[in-house]
Amino acid sequence: MPKKKSKKVKKNGKGVGGKADVHAHEEGKRNKSLLGHNAIFTPEVIDDIHIKSQLGRYRMRGMALMKKIPTFDDLVFLPGTLTRFVIEGYREKCETKTVIGPRCENPIELDIPVYITGMSFGALSYEAKTALARGATMAGSATCSGEGGMIPDERRYSEKWYYQCIQSRYGFNPHHAQLADGIEVFIGQGQKVGMGGHLMGQKVTDQVAEMRSLPSGIDQRSPARHPDWLGPDDLALKVEELRQLTKNKVPIQLKLGASKVYDDVRMAAKCDPDSIYLDGMEGSTGAGPHICLLYTSPSPRDATLSRMPSSA
C-alpha cells in the first residue's frame, strides 16, 4: 500500500503558530477590549451605579481627593533681580513671620505662613488632635478646634489656637471661645462647598456626643448655613457679636469654600473680618457625598488665581 503523505504545518503559513493565527489572536484581543471597555461607563462607574442603586442614595466617604488636580507645585517662584532686592542666603535671614489681625489687641503672629486647618475631634482622634497641636507649636504656627468643640489638652498644647464657629449651634461654648487666640467662622469647605457637616455614626462616641450635646451612635449633620444669618448683612452682625464676646481682643476669620471666588471674597470683606480663609477641593473631609468630593469647587491653585469678576 502506498504510504500516506504526512500533512506539513508551515510555521510561517496559516497553520498552528503561523502569522495568520497570531494576527487573529491579536484581533480577538482588540475586539474583546473594545467590547469590554467604555470610556464613559468604566468598570468603576458601573460599580458605583450598582452600589447607589442598592443604597437608594448617593455614596458617602471621607478622606482626600482621588484624582489629579492642578496644585501649587505647578507654579514657579520669580527670583529677585533688580526689581526686588536679593538677600545673601548663607548670612542673611529670610523673614516669614505673618501677622493676622494687627488691629486687634492680641493679633496672631505666625513664624511661617502655614496654618493647620480645623479638623474635628470626631473625624480624627485625641492622639491626632494633640499631636497636631504640639507640632503647630513647635513650628510656630497655629491650629484650630474644628467642628464640635474644644478638647482641653489640644488647647493646652497649642500656643496659637482658633476656635471654630460652625453652621449650627451645637458644640459651641462661649466660654471656650473666650479662651481662643482667634475665632474662625465656618461658612464652607473646599471638598463640599455649600453643604453642611456630616459625622458618621460609627465615629460618634460617648465623648464626642457629650461635647456636641447630641445622641451617640447615630449620624450627626450640621446645616448648610447657620440659622442666625440669611445673607452677608446677617453675617456681619454675627462677626460683630463674636467681637463683643471676645472684647475685640482676638482676630475673627471667615472660612469659605472656593466657588465664585471674586464675588464671595468681596462680600465676605464687607463683613469686616480680620482675615478670609479660602479652602479648595484639595482639602479632605471626614464624610461627604462622593460625587461632590470629586466634582465641585476649584483646586486651591485655580481658586487663588481667580481674580476676574464672574460672568454669571
What does each model-found stretch correspond to?
Residues 2-114, 118, 123-137, 141-142, ...:
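Conserved, well-structured core domains of diverse proteins
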Residues 295-300:
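Conserved small/polar residues in nucleotide/adenosyl-binding loops
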